[in-house]
Amino acid sequence: MGRIRQTFIKRAGEDLVEKYEDRLTTDFETNKKVIDEVAEIATKRLRNRVAGYVTKKMKKVDA
């Protein structure tokens, strides 16, 4: 079984996908850079978790 992401990570990721869907891709590294530019996220670890969630959401949209 996989790990469950915390609610605030999901909420932040869904807000970012809603606002910046045109800038986000299915590539994790690109999404990290975009999130750095558009969002105020306190730590690198939290940014990476949000970027991973956003990447997963974008892959579902493409499928």
From Swiss-Prot:
Keywords: Ribonucleoprotein, Ribosomal protein. InterPro entries: Ribosomal_eS17, Ribosomal_eS17_CS, Ribosomal_eS17_sf. GO terms for cellular component: cytosol; ribonucleoprotein complex; ribosome. One of its GO terms (molecular function) is structural constituent of ribosome. Signal peptide: none annotated. GO terms for biological process: translation. Gene3D superfamilies: Ribosomal protein S17e-like. It holds the Pfam family Ribosomal_S17e. Disulfide bonds: none annotated. HAMAP family: Ribosomal_eS17. NCBIfam families: PRK01151.1. Belongs to the eukaryotic ribosomal protein eS17 family. This is Small ribosomal subunit protein eS17. The gene is rps17e.
